[in-house]
Amino acid sequence: MLNIYNVNSLVHWEERDIKLRDDFVRFFSDEVANFLRSANAAWDVRRVEAPTLMPRSLVSDAYSNSDIWVQERMSNTETELVLRPETTPSTYAYMQHLLGNHSRTRLPLCVWQAGRSFRREQDQPSKHVRLKEFWQLEFQCAFTADSGNDYHAAALEPVRRMIASVIHLPARTVPSDRLPAYSEVTMDIEVDNGDKWMEVCSISKRTDFPQRYRSQPKKGPAIDHDVTVLEIAIGLDRCVYNWNIAASR
């Protein structure tokens, strides 16, 4: 991780770290899919890539223009675009597309992305890894709220072990110090890198999926369900950074 520009929170990544990040994406995505399907073989797990530019209207109200990178509009008719602060809205849009296009896609459905996101983070030393441009690996795992399965609680220890197994630092699960409005509960996974316990992953039970899900039993009328989303959000840059700390010891 090189600060060549001499601008806090803007870094270059060299080939070794890029390959390591790619390895993390492969391993983590395989492990999450295996965990979900071991809990319920019906899970449909898919990957998608969405543009890093997105309509401003899709960004959560929790982000003001001072938090994100907004494109200047050249005319009043031009769609206001921003560099995405997270992958979730574009993943949700794809999930709605799948569920609404008569493709017989059903819940439970997990869609994940690995890619760059952008936020106007306050300038901090690089060791805190609060970057203005950063890599996220985010899984949105949607299921009916009345399913009776607590996938959030079931995911905590498998995800902690998964991360600890590759970063090779002590890892713990703690309640998040912030609870987003969209979440019933959020837990963080932190690793001890010798300088601090650093958050590398958050696991939330989200209630903000944009639509209800309609199932059609073999007999009787269709049933509308509320949708709950298990979100597993992993900071890939922080995983690479902490892996390098462990490897240097």
How should these model regions be labeled?
Residues M1-R249:
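TRNA-recognition modules of translation machinery and tRNA-sensing kinases, especially anticodon-binding
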